[in-house]
């Protein structure tokens, strides 16, 4: 069964728009207006800081649908129309199939564990003794614990030790979904796909709640091939 959520609706809407523009022979002429058309002035922004960020995300989500990934961007000022021209003239497709849209990636959490307000500030402090890095700290007034995320290595020993289950595991959806461990964060907290490990199963794409992982589409090339091959 196909996954149905807002991320997939957005992906389908954008893909439909680009194909419609191509079918009308206006892809190059009108593609630069797509981010503004999809996020007009005073529109409500969902999950982003501002409308300008949302428009940037629309732009970068268009790139893989045109057959590019983020490494193809040499100049941030290059308009979508230039990429559209290149897509229409492309003779060779890219080797990789999946890519991460860094502008859309929310970076999720750096460490997978956190202490909730269920912490009773107990005397035993089993979490503190279980931590191999000394990442558990305590509020001097409430005695409630907190995790120093700069030190935490996400080993989960505190999670297992807490008798109140006050420590929660926070997953990173794309990393959790990947069956071969091909996704990890860089020094800026943005996810990257290790092409030497990736098996292109697409589970990370379906799992990301921000729609930051895209398949590099060859749809336009496929349509052209089909049209030219039909007698």
Predicted segments, located by residue:
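Ferredoxin-type iron-sulfur electron-transfer modules and their immediate structural context
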Residues: 1-161, 165-177, 181
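Iron-sulfur-cluster electron-transfer modules
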Residues: 165, 170-171, 175-176, 180-231
């Amino acid at each position: 069964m196909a996954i149905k959520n807002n991320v997939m609706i957005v992906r389908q809407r954008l893909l439909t728009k680009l194909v419609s523009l191509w079918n009308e022979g206006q892809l190059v002429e009108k593609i630069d207006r797509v981010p503004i058309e999809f996020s007009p002035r005073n529109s409500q922004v969902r999950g982003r800081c501002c409308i300008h960020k949302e428009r940037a995300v629309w732009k970068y989500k268009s790139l893989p649908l045109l057959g590019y990934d983020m490494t193809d961007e040499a100049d941030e000022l290059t308009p979508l129309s230039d990429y559209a021209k290149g897509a229409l003239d492309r003779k060779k497709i890219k080797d990789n199939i999946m890519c991460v849209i860094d502008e859309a990636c929310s970076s999720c959490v750096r460490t997978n564990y956190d202490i909730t307000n269920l912490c009773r500030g107990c005397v035993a402090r089993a979490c503190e003794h279980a931590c191999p890095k000394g990442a558990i700290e305590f509020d001097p007034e409430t005695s409630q614990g907190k995790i120093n995320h700069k030190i935490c290595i996400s080993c989960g020993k505190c999670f297992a030790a807490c008798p109140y289950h006050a420590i929660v595991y926070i997953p990173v959806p794309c990393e959790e979904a990947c069956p071969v461990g091909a996704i990890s964060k860089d020094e800026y907290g943005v996810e990257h796909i290790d092409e030497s490990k990736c098996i292109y199963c697409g589970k990370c794409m379906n799992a990301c709640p921000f729609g930051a992982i895209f398949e590099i589409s060859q749809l336009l090339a496929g349509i052209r091939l089909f049209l030219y091959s039909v007698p």
